[in-house]
Amino acid sequence: MKLNLYVLTPKRIIWDCEVKEIILSTNSGQIGVLPNHAPINTAVDMGPLRIRLLNDQWLTAVLWSGFARIVNNEIIILGNDAELGSDIDPEEAQQALEIAEANLSKAEGTKELVEAKLALRRARIRVEAVNWIPPSN
């Protein structure tokens, strides 16, 4: 059996194809979705989206929050923004992480601290996405 996966943002369609499985970051943790999954509507948290293609190859995307609906082997993810893992430059992601860590240590005041923590979280997620090693089949 297959799942129809659609990942949409206000700017573009990120994904539109059949897949075997996904692992999705939600506000209550990561969930795995296989064919015939129970219907669910859930908030999507900032984090990785793991996609297992029909040929068993795994791909990674990064979702920057949104909403997901899973019903009748169809997954529709409406994201505020998203990036494909293949579009993320590993060196640039690592550099952004180092800058975010430095900015957090220099942050003063509540607003700066919140912004620095958010930037650090985003940078960590991007680094995690490009460094992820898929499970062996």
From Swiss-Prot:
The UniProt entry, under PANTHER family, shows: ATP SYNTHASE DELTA/EPSILON CHAIN (PTHR13822), ATP SYNTHASE EPSILON CHAIN, CHLOROPLASTIC (PTHR13822:SF10)
Q: Return the similarity comment.
A: Belongs to the ATPase epsilon chain family.
Q: Which organism is it from?
A: Sorghum bicolor (Sorghum)
Keyword annotations for this protein, in alphabetical order, are:
ATP synthesis, CF(1), Chloroplast, Hydrogen ion transport, Ion transport, Membrane, Plastid, Thylakoid, Transport
Q: Identify the NCBIfam families for this entry.
A: ATP_synt_epsi
Q: How does it sit in the membrane?
A: Peripheral membrane protein
Q: What does this protein do?
A: Produces ATP from ADP in the presence of a proton gradient across the membrane.
Q: How does it assemble?
A: F-type ATPases have 2 components, CF(1) - the catalytic core - and CF(0) - the membrane proton channel. CF(1) has five subunits: alpha(3), beta(3), gamma(1), delta(1), epsilon(1). CF(0) has three main subunits: a, b and c.
**Signal sequence: where?**
none
Reply yes or no: does the keyword Plastid apply.
yes
Q: Which Pfam families match?
A: ATP-synt_DE, ATP-synt_DE_N
Any one GO CC term of this protein is:
proton-transporting ATP synthase complex
Looking up InterPro entries in the UniProt record yields: ATP_synth_F1_dsu/esu, ATP_synth_F1_dsu/esu_N, ATP_synth_F1_esu_C, ATPsynth_dsu/esu_N
Would you say which domain of life the source belongs to? Eukaryota
Annotated protein name in UniProt: ATP synthase epsilon chain, chloroplastic
One example of a Gene Ontology biological process annotation: proton motive force-driven ATP synthesis
